[in-house]
Amino acid sequence: IDSLANVFEAGTDPLLLRIKVEQGNDYIYYKTKTPITVNSVHTEVLGEKPTSTAVVKAFYKGTNILGERFDGFEGADPVDGDSNASQPDTPPVSFDLSGSVIEGWKEAIPHMKVGERWLIYIPWKYCYGSTGNSNTTLIPGYSALIFDIQLLDADSIQKKSEPSKD
């Protein structure tokens, strides 16, 4: 993740963007990706940002910095009703941003708009910290993680008058 800061500061990757975390001087880096066309995007909130307490629905894949998948959809893209796909449909996952999700998701997802797809690089202290995740050997302590997330729905959205923190 430190090398991402160097890339961002040097401006060598114009697609690399960042979000300043709420507390501290750290950043979470991300790139926008082309979203897959899906039937499960909630069109009434398309283009809106969720609140920090929203229950959101998303496709996601989590990998460690070696690219080893530990959770979420398989392959390069989620599958949503494509009968020609070589893998089964990817069920979207719903989760509460004010609940027990990693801090990096709580920081990044409220900056996303429903319908967007981001590749998010999260520093270890906003993931599973120094202890790692005991449910998998793929996330030892001090692991930075990468998440491919396509936001499909949010049960509460930011008001238009709220200033953006981007």
Indicate residue ranges for each PLM-predicted region.
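Cross-family detector of peptidyl-prolyl cis-trans isomerase
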Residues: I1-D166
